[in-house]
């Protein structure tokens, strides 16, 4: 790979244009973009003369849908890394991917992955009805437990020496130690979708599983023979251990298709007539209710604009609408409305009821959700 394609002015400027989308409101980004010719030229000069020094990323924690540590990279470093990722790392690493690796790639994503699983279930039904089994895997702490030696070795095998050294420099600066990454950068996402590529080929080409799908570390196999799937499970676990990963024993199991499959936030149900129904998973509903209650409480205290809470709910609602969720959405709309009314009533209550006689703030609904599919 020609260095000019990674650290040349045109490559860096194009990368800057991509990186600024959606974050131009940030002061640091706005400053860089407003002074783009000078800033990009300076970055190019530093990279070509070997004087480039990346800055320290900022680490923070998100709690929804689950608790994770995230790294935020300074904008100028993101510009360089985006060019490195887009022009070298992504095209080289994804070249060997199987079709049914669905995360973080152009033309793929969660919606298409869900459609693909529906297609698999319909295909299975045409040959076997509902008399089949699923082997589903859960890796314990996928990113936090990634072995640095394994990831670096994986990149070394496929990249030219110069490109590999650039990737290695970034990894060593941002992620010291020998284990664990924060999934806040594109480079680590590429590592995430690449880490199990060897396993994908093993499952498809040696175990001969045709109905296999993976989204990052969430993957499953469908087959009519339970005993065969159980044998596959043990072989796959040994492969994962060889990569440095551990599985969650309780969640990694073989079970009947009739039990339903939870995948990417939805429960997939194959009916006796061959229809595939999607319901928002109970865990997802429960987590969103808890999240909304917390956001509404913060908004009532003046810590968060109501528009931000509305946007969060609208985003979840759009996600839920992709399933058979009419009744669930009706009930969630009522629940969301009740959260705002509940707070207002609580304030009125505090104003009119003498101290010591008021009741606590009671949840409008308890539990994992009473919508469809639960």
Language-model segment annotations:
Residues 45-66, 79, 160-174:
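Reverse-transcriptase-like RNA-dependent polymerase core
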């Amino acid at each position: 790979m020609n260095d000019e394609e990674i650290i040349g002015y045109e490559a860096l400027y194009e990368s800057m244009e991509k990186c600024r989308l959606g974050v131009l409101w940030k002061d640091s980004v706005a400053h860089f973009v407003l002074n783009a010719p000078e800033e990009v030229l300076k970055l190019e000069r530093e990279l070509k003369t070997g004087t480039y020094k990346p800055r320290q990323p900022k680490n923070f924690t998100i709690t929804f849908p689950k608790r994770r540590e995230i790294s935020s990279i300074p904008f100028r470093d993101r510009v360089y890394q985006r060019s490195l990722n887009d022009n070298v790392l992504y095209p080289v690493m994804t070249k060997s991917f199987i079709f049914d690796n669905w995360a973080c790639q152009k033309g793929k994503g969660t919606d298409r992955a869900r459609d693909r699983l529906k297609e698999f279930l319909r295909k299975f039904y045409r040959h076997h009805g509902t008399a089949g089994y699923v082997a589903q895997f859960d890796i314990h702490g996928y990113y936090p437990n990634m072995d640095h030696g394994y990831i670096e070795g994986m990149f070394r095998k496929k990249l030219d020496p110069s490109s590999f050294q650039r990737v290695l420099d970034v990894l060593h600066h941002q992620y010291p130690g020998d284990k664990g990454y924060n999934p806040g950068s594109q480079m680590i996402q590429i590592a995430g979708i690449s880490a199990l590529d060897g396993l994908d080929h093993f499952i498809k080409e040696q175990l001969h599983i045709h109905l296999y799908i993976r989204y990052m570390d969430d993957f499953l196999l469908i087959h009519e023979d339970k005993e065969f799937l159980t044998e596959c499970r043990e072989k796959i676990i040994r492969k994962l251990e060889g990569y440095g990963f551990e599985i969650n024993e309780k969640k990694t199991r073989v079970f009947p298709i009739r039990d339903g499959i939870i995948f990417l936030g939805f429960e997939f149900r194959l009916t006796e007539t061959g229809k595939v129904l999607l319901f928002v998973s109970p865990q997802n509903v429960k987590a969103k209710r808890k999240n909304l209650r917390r956001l509404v409480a913060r908004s009532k205290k003046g810590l968060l604009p109501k528009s931000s809470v509305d946007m969060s709910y609208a985003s979840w609602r759009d996600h839920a609408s992709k399933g058979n969720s009419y009744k669930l959405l009706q009930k969630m709309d009522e629940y969301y409305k009740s959260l705002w009314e509940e707070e207002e009533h609580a304030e009125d209550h505090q104003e009119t009821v003498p101290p010591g006689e008021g009741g606590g703030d009671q949840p409008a609904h308890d539990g994992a959700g009473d919508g469809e599919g639960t």
